[in-house]
Amino acid sequence: MSIFKGSAVALITPFTQDGVNFDELKKLLEWHIKNKTDAIVICGTTGEASTMSLNERKETIKYTVETVNKRIPVIAGTGSNNTKSSVEMSIWAEKIGVDGVLVITPYYNKTTQKGLIEHFKSINDNINIPIILYNVPGRTGLNILPETLYAMRDLKNICAIKEASGNISQIAKIKALCRDRFDIYSGNDDQIVPILSLGGSGVISVLANIIPQTVHDMCFSYFQGKTTDALNLQLDTLSLTNSLFIETNPIPIKTAMNLLNFNAGPLRLPLCSMDEKNLNTLKTDLKGYGLIK
């Protein structure tokens, strides 16, 4: 039940001062389809879902599904630290036509590994579309252990994991335990090729917001056996990637997009404008990559 192979953009949400800029969202979606993005992830971390109202999230997901119109998969962020809310949002997302859901581990209240299994099972048992688990312990304080993922192998709708732990050894252990049962997507743009080398299926990418073709090419060069080409793309984009995470994501990527004349709009508090020194570093890397003058 694989959803996509290659590069899914973790899409920013373009805002106006008081809402979502749907005109700009449409332009971004069309641009990504034209520039080889393989799937759209909407209302995730990079999309600032945590500072959007429920109605805004629903309107944005529905608009994305309607605009993309099955040309590439649309994956909606539907998770929270409340199991009932996660289930309800996932049921709603399936009804309006998303191709899959991205479900983060519960945060703040955290739970145990047993609680994780029960949380994800509740979502699995209430929908019939693919589920990607999202493991990002640096944000949630909770790590999905390889053994825990293996214990969920019989939950038929759980098809993949977005691995943003940064722990290559853990990802190798996932592959060793689970083999081909789950797709593994890199959640870190500086680890795309390393995770592909462990049998990964692609990336859910922040970097693809500004260079989608390159991230797609990195993945498909690897899939086609052109591993040196893929590695060179990984290394060539490393400095730019580092700049995009010099402050909390999505502060730098949204700043970069505004510098590139996308109408990404403002960040929502508590996210704020970049420190001047970090902004200059970002500008230097954007210039170095030929994206701005």
Swiss-Prot record:
Keywords: Amino-acid biosynthesis, Cytoplasm, Diaminopimelate biosynthesis, Lyase, Lysine biosynthesis, Schiff base. The record marks T45, Y108 as: Part of a proton relay during catalysis. PROSITE patterns: DHDPS_1, DHDPS_2. Its EC number is 4.3.3.7. Pathway: Amino-acid biosynthesis; L-lysine biosynthesis via DAP pathway; (S)-tetrahydrodipicolinate from L-aspartate: step 3/4. It is an enzyme of class 4 (lyase). It holds the Pfam family DHDPS. Homotetramer; dimer of dimers. This is 4-hydroxy-tetrahydrodipicolinate synthase 1. It comes from Clostridium acetobutylicum (strain ATCC 824 / DSM 792 / JCM 1419 / IAM 19013 / LMG 5710 / NBRC 13948 / NRRL B-527 / VKM B-1787 / 2291 / W).
